Amino acid sequence: MSELLLELFSEEIPAFMQKNAEEGYLNIFTKIFEENEIFAKVQVFVGPRRITLHATHLPKITLPKEEEIKGPSIEAPEAAINGFCKAHNVSKLELPTKLISNQLYYFFVKKTEEREIKEILPEIIIEAINKYSWAKSMFWGDYKIKWIRPLRNILCIFDGEILPMQFGHLTANNITYGHRLTDNKKLEVTDFEDYRNKLLENHVILERAKREAIIKTGLLELASSHELIIKEDNRLVEEVVGLSEFPVVLLGKIPQKFLELPKEVLISSMRTHQKYFCLFDKTGNFTPYFLFVSNGRFTNAELVIQGNEKVLSARLSDALYFCKQDIAKTLESRLGQLEAVTFHAKLGNLREKIERITDICNYIAPNNKDLITAARLCKSDLVSEMVGEFPDLQGIMGYYYAKHEGLNAEIAAAIRDHYKPQGLSDNLPSGNAALLALADKLDSLVGLMIAGETPTGSGDPYALRRQALGIIRIILENKLELNFNDLINFSINLYKDSSDENKNLIISFFEERAKFYFKNDYDIALINAVLDLNLVDTNFKLDALKEFLIEDAGKQLLNAYKRASNIIGDQKITGLVDASLFSTQPEKELFEVIQKISPQIIDSIADKDYKKALNLLSSLLTPITSFFDNVLVNDSDPKIAQNRLSLLQNICELFDKVAKFNRL
C-alpha cells in the first residue's frame, strides 16, 4: 500500500480558523477519495503556517470498472436520443437496451480502465484544495489562486517521490521549513515519518493535540510551582495553540504602578489583547503575575519574558492615561457626546435611546430615583477613552467612574450590570440593574423590530432572539410581576412609526421565545395551555399543572374535561343552569360541588395559588364520573338536555379559568 504526504505552507493562518480548516479538509479529502473509490486512512494537521495531509493504505492502481448510465426510452423523441448519444460519443446502434417497468430504455456502459493512482492524484488534490471555503480569503501579487493567506510552498510526496503537481504558480517539491524564529531553514523530506521527525528537530510540533497538551500542562505546573491558581480558559488555550508551533509557557510580572487600574482592565489587556493568562491566589484574588505562551524555545528565556512585560507595560500605560483622562469628566457631562453616536440609522442616536430607556424605567418603577439616574448615565462610558480602547469594558468602566464620582453602589452596579445576561450561561442582574437591563433590552428589541430587523431563518444580526431570552430570564428569575403586554405597548409608543402590526409582531415574537425558553422543562402542549405574557404567572401555572397531571387523579380529571368538551362540541351554550330541571341525584350533586368550589377557585387564582385551584377541581372527579355513568345528557326532553349541556359548560369554564385544558 502507498503513502501520500501533502503540505500547504503559507503565511500565518488566523488561529480561530485553524480548527475548522482541519475538520473541513479532513472531510473533503476523505469524501473525494471515496468518490474516486480510493479508500485510504486520512489525517489532517493544521498549525500557524502549514496544513498537512497524510494519507496511507492507498492502492497503487485504480481497478477497472463499468458504470451503466440510463438514457431515454426507445419511444422518446429522436432529439432526446441523439442528445444522449452525442453526450457519450456513441451511435444509437451501439447502445444496449433494458426493460424497466414494461418500458425499454437505452443505456450507455461507461468503462474506466485501470490507472496508476499517481496519475490521478494531482487532479484530486487540486480539487480538494479548492473545495474548502474559507470565511475570508485573498488574492496576492499577480497570482490567480485565492487562499486564506499567501501560499509560499507546496510539498507533495507519493511513495518517497515528488508527485508532479502544479497549483497556481507553485510547483510541488519535497521541501518544508522549520520554525520561523529559531530554525527557519529548508528541510528535504522523503516520507511522513521523516517529515514529522525533521519538523520536531527544528522546533515544529505537527500535532495540534500535542501542542494543546503541552500548553495545558505547562500552565498548570508553572502556576502551581508559584502557589498560584489559573482559571480554566479553554477558548484562550485553543487560540494560543493556533499561534504557536513550539509552545513554551513562561511567567511574567505586572509592574506595581499598574495595579491601581481596575482588575477588569488588567484582565482585558492581558487576555484579549496579549493572549496572556491571569493568575490568582488561593483565595481567588487577582495577583500581579501572568503566564504566556512563547512560540519557540529560546536560549535566553529571561529576554523573552522582559519583552512580553515591556509590551504589556506599554498597553497598560495607555490604559492608565486613558483612565486619568476619563475621570476628569463626569458621566453626566458626556451625555451630549452620545448625540453623535448612532444607535441605528432608522432609530436615532444613543442620547435618544437613553431618553426612551429612562421613560421605560419610570414606567416600571415610578419614583425610583436611583434607577432613573442609572438609566440616564448607563451609556455615558461608551464615549470614554477607555471603552474606545477596550470595548468589552462597556458598563464596567461606567461602574468605576460612577463610584469615583461618589454615586451610590446601587447606581454604579446598575450601570455595570445592565448589559447582562449576554447569553444563556451568563449571570443575571438583580435589583435596579435588572430593571435597567430589562428596559434597555426591551427598547432595543422593540425599536429594531419596528426598523425591520426582525430575525429570519437565515440570520439574526442584532441577536434579538438572545435579547428576548435575556428579558424573559430577567423577569422570571427576579420574579417581576409585570403586565408585559402593557409594557410592550408603552415601549412601542415611544417610537413615532409604531403600528398595531408592529405590536402584534413583537408580542408574537416574545411568545415564541417564551415557548423556546420553557420547553426545556415542560411539554409544549402544557406551555400552550397556560402561556401568556405574565411570565411569572405562567411559570407558577406550569409548575402546578405539570405536577397535577403526573398524578392519576389529574389524568382522570383531564379525561373527564375532554369528555365534557366533546359532548358540547361546536354547540354554543348560552343558558344558565336551572336546578329545578334536575331529575337525577348525580346531576344535583355535581351542580352542588360546582357551586361550592367556584368561588374558592376564583380566590385561589387571585392569590396565584394554582395548586390549590387544581386540588379544588379534583373534588369534581367523583361527581362528574357518577354523572357520566348514570345520566344521559341528550335527554328526549329538549329543556333537560339543554340544562345538562349548560352544566357541562359550567365545568369546562371552571377548568379554563386555570388553564386552556382543550390544548392538553
From Swiss-Prot:
BP term (GO), one: glycyl-tRNA aminoacylation
MF-aspect GO terms: arginine-tRNA ligase activity; ATP binding; glycine-tRNA ligase activity
Localization, UniProt: Cytoplasm
Keyword Transmembrane appears in the UniProt entry: no
Catalytic activity: tRNA(Gly) + glycine + ATP = glycyl-tRNA(Gly) + AMP + diphosphate
InterPro entries: DALR_anticod-bd (IPR008909), Gly-tRNA-synth_bsu (IPR015944), Gly-tRNA-synth_heterodimer (IPR006194)
Pfam assignment, any one: tRNA_synt_2f
Enzyme class (EC, first level): ligase
A single GO cellular-component term on record: cytosol
Record-listed E.C. numbers: 6.1.1.14
Keyword set, alphabetical order: Aminoacyl-tRNA synthetase, ATP-binding, Cytoplasm, Ligase, Nucleotide-binding, Protein biosynthesis
Record has Nucleotide-binding as a keyword: yes
Assembly mode: Tetramer of two alpha and two beta subunits.
PANTHER family: GLYCINE--TRNA LIGASE, CHLOROPLASTIC_MITOCHONDRIAL 2, GLYCYL-TRNA SYNTHETASE
Sequence similarity: Belongs to the class-II aminoacyl-tRNA synthetase family.
Name used for this protein in its record: Glycine--tRNA ligase beta subunit
Source organism per UniProt: Rickettsia conorii (strain ATCC VR-613 / Malish 7)
Gene assigned in the entry: glyS
